[in-house]
Amino acid sequence: MASLDKNMLLNYVPVYVMLPLGVVSVNNVFEDPEGLKEQLVQLREAGVDGVMVDVWWGIIEQKGPKQYDWSAYKSLFQLVQECGLKLQAIMSFHQCGGNVGDVVNIPIPQWVLDIGESDPDIFYTNRSGTRDKEYLTIGVDNKPIFHGRTAIEVYSDYMKSFRENMSDFLKSEVIIDIEVGLGPAGELRYPSYPQNQGWVFPGIGEFQCYDKYLKAEFKAAAARAGHSEWELPDDAGTYNDVPESTEFFKTNGTYLTEKGKFFLTWYSNQLLNHGDEILDEANKAFLGCKVNLAIKVSGIHWWYKAQNHAAELTAGYYNLDDRDGYRPIAKMVSRHHASLNFTCLEMRDSEQSSDAQSGPQELVQQVLSGGWRENIEVAGENALSRYDATAYNQIILNARPQGVNKDGPPKHRMYGVTYLRLSDELLQQSNFDIFKKFVVKMHADQDYCEDPQEYNHGIPPLKRSEPKIPVDVLNEATKPIPPFPWDSETDMKVDG
């Protein structure tokens, strides 16, 4: 292997691998440490920098309010440390089960579900009244209905307890990333396309703001705007519609009217504010730790090439050809010294069926460029498991869109990429051989580098968030700016 070249190291993009969903069981048991250790040793030998793991609220606080049990996760983290890997920990305040690739079922804590029995409006709700129990509605963020605590206080207490109980791993800088879950699948979005309610790709999804709390907030906002007669949309169709079959999204539809724009601005602002408030709590909880805070944004690539961007709009990303729905999120993230994690890095437009009007490549370019323009770090992951050179090459291209620079840092470089996900299939000889090549190419043909400072990733102690940015200032970032240029293919192919 080549020794470490100082200039080439500045092109190094660390690679993490997501651990299996059920590594800690729903009963809070670390199931198969020996089996996992074998796999982690293989990852370490392949040059992988670290692993990512969901730290499930539904496992840790399942016994009752503030009754946390971190023991199984401590054993897991100990093993990761012994194997010489870094850790990205996700504060997973959502249910596992009901989304793409969910093979395990981990509901949110039973005592929270019990509150939902008497008050089902704590859950996101669509227009027909179906509740989604995978994550609490934004409407209860500041409602003290969880045994005297608000939802945000519940999340905040959980993160503080994590810091207290995992202080050894934080001090030894084994844990380098805290990804703060902000919605279903841990993503800052509404649960607009739930498979467990019958959604199938490429359905436009549904708005999820019909619980009594969000409904009341919308009515109050409409009244303040002098339109107390305005109601939430009733013409946006159902999960598996195409945009043109709905009054809301069709050409010259409701989404372009004053009322439609008011609703979409309100709906997306709710999400911005939700992320902002919880990141503020995360920043307080981990203040002074040498960790990166991160949030995850979903790659909703279907209907991206349609004028209405319907699937993005129902998820809360108010993104149109003349309005950037992602840069305001990056601006919000920037005040907390946090980074943005994006998905679908492996996808190419040519692999998508034309009737979904899908644009994953343009979407990735838009979101990454927006993050870089707001001076934040951007990381990412693949959306679906892939083991082929084409997918790996696409990820490498997105990680360094203008290629490597042999004389220093490249023009743009992603902060890291997390591969989804560790499995027996990944470790099959032929699959693992190409994965190992992928790691080497992400590392710019350099050996594994133990010290992140060598590739400009030293992590300073987390500083306190900057002052709150008013939402109308955040929304100044909706002005579209063309993305940075992207090479047509990577200069570091796994099969080159």
Curated annotation (Swiss-Prot):
PROSITE patterns assigned to the protein according to its UniProt record, in alphabetical order: BETA_AMYLASE_1, BETA_AMYLASE_2
An annotated GO BP: polysaccharide catabolic process
Catalytic activity of the protein: Hydrolysis of (1->4)-alpha-D-glucosidic linkages in polysaccharides so as to remove successive maltose units from the non-reducing ends of the chains
InterPro entries: Glyco_hydro_14, Glyco_hydro_14_CS, Glyco_hydro_14B_pln, Glycoside_hydrolase_SF
Organism of derivation: Vigna unguiculata
Residues reported in the UniProt entry to bind substrate: 54, 94, 102, 296, 301, 343, 382-383, 421
EC number(s) stated in the UniProt entry for this protein: 3.2.1.2
GO terms for MF: beta-amylase activity
Family statement: Belongs to the glycosyl hydrolase 14 family.
Name under which the protein is recorded: Beta-amylase
Keywords: Carbohydrate metabolism, Glycosidase, Hydrolase, Polysaccharide degradation
Origin: domain of life: Eukaryota
Active site: 187 (proton donor), 381 (proton acceptor)
SUPFAM superfamilies: (Trans)glycosidases (SSF51445)
Recorded coiled-coil stretches: none
